[in-house]
């Protein structure tokens, strides 16, 4: 094409018009919008030809009772789709409270007998969780955004661990909250004393994931209790228990003694409900009321009817998800033994994923080699963990295939 051809001039004209439109739109944006750094989720391939071990989803499907019950409910009551849903998800909250009372908040340690579950002795809550102590929302991400809005002030700097759920700094930026980042200890655990010291100095509340993501390390309930005892009782203390069902110790029993404790949980991991977008809070009724006020100021009907029905049925069949969680924990332990025996470094996990490193191959290359063989894992291009990949625990068949691939990575 000649450098002065009409076609080239036309393309240049179109490009300039496009840039002008972008510039005009940018001039409309607030300074808040210009400074946003959005969360980057794991790959979600549209063709679904990959085995997905990159987003910490449950490899097992929802229980049969959920699928059958959903069809029956909609067939018998089609108006549930034509009318607005219950804005407070009351039946779902009752089901969540009942499930927590029956399981203690750790499915993988429950006893299962004839479709009934009971908590291990160490996981018994010791008091009754009531529906008034539950808040439900569109996934724990929306729930967390409301928590940030309600309890973390831009006047106070928020303390975050160096490696944590990457949506926390995103929300901090969204709400104009400065952050202090505390490096992990040499064993990848949280530097509790440093976190508490900075939080006290900054006059802020606290938030952290337990078990932690992406490291998989879990703090004991006793250690969390000690943190609460040293924290300001007038500041919110948020524990994100997204992965607790796979072997952590739930902090739900601590709610009786600490009125500033707020626990966030999700249906996306242990309850095979990532596609539902259903998360919830367990806390004292006054805190629940405050988060509800935020919800009602933004979206009075956050949970659709199908999600409410599905969540309720899932809770009523906790026995099934407890069995799935036990299988995932068993595969995790088997995978960690494989890593030890084949020269891979890993951080011992209490979640449904493991953070692993090959001593002689970069994290990016490990990710690429595994992907070339039809499996997706997660690589973080982040200083400190860029040599690692995070691998979700799948079914035995999926993990056996992964092991064969990893044996060849030298």
Model-predicted regions and their roles:
Residues 5, 180, 186-245:
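Active-site phosphate-binding strand-loop segment of PLP-dependent enzymes
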Residues 12-25:
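Short, Lys/Arg-enriched N-terminal segments with co-localized hydrophobic residues
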Residues 21-24, 222, 369-373, 378, ...:
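PLP-dependent enzyme catalytic core of the Aspartate aminotransferase-like
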Residues 25-105, 109-110, 121-139, 146:
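N-terminal small-domain helix-loop-helix segment of the aminotransferase-like
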Residues 105, 129-134, 155-157, 234, ...:
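Short acidic capping loops at alpha-helix termini that bridge into adjacent secondary structure
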Residues 150-171:
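Conserved PLP-anchoring active-site segment centered on the Schiff-base-forming lysine
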Residues 260-339, 344-347:
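PLP-dependent aminotransferase class I/II
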Residues 329, 341-373:
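Conserved PLP-binding catalytic core of the aspartate aminotransferase-like
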């Amino acid at each position: 094409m000649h450098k002065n051809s009409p076609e080239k001039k036309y393309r240049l004209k179109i490009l300039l018009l496009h840039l002008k439109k972008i510039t005009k739109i940018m001039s409309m944006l607030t300074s808040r919008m210009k400074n946003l750094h959005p969360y980057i989720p794991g790959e979600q391939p549209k063709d679904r030809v990959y085995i997905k071990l990159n987003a910490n989803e449950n490899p097992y499907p929802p229980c049969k009772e959920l699928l059958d019950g959903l069809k029956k409910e909609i067939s018998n009551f089609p108006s549930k789709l034509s009318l607005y849903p219950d804005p407070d998800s009351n039946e779902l909250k009752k089901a969540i409270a009942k499930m927590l009372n029956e399981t203690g908040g750790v499915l993988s340690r429950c006893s299962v007998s004839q479709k009934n579950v009971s908590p291990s002795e160490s996981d018994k809550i010791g008091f009754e969780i009531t529906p008034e102590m539950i808040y439900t929302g569109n996934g724990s991400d929306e729930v967390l955004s409301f928590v940030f809005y309600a309890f973390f002030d831009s006047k106070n700097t928020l303390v975050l661990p160096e490696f944590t759920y990457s949506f926390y700094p995103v929300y901090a930026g969204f709400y104009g909250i400065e952050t202090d980042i505390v490096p992990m200890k040499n064993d990848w655990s949280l530097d509790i004393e440093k976190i508490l010291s900075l939080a006290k100095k900054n006059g802020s509340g606290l938030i952290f994931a337990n078990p932690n993501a992406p490291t998989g390390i879990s703090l004991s309930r006793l250690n969390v209790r000690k943190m609460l005892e040293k924290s300001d009782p007038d500041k919110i203390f948020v524990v994100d228990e997204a992965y607790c069902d796979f072997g952590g110790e739930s902090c739900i029993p601590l709610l009786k003694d600490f009125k500033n404790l707020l626990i966030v949980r999700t249906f996306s991991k242990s309850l095979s409900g990532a596609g539902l977008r259903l998360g919830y809070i367990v806390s004292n009724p006054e805190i629940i009321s405050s988060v509800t006020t935020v919800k009602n100021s933004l979206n009075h009907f956050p949970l659709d009817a199908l999600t409410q029905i599905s969540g309720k049925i899932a809770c009523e069949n906790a026995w099934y998800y407890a069995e799935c969680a036990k299988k995932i924990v068993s595969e995790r332990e088997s995978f960690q033994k494989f890593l030890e025996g084949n020269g891979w470094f890993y951080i011992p996990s209490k979640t449904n994923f493991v953070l692993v490193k090959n001593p002689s191959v970069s994290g990016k290359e490990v990710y690429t080699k595994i992907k070339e063989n039809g499996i997706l894992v997660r690589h973080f291009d982040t200083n400190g963990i860029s040599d690692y990949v995070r691998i979700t625990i799948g079914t035995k068949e999926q993990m056996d295939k992964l092991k064969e691939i990893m044996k060849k990575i030298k």
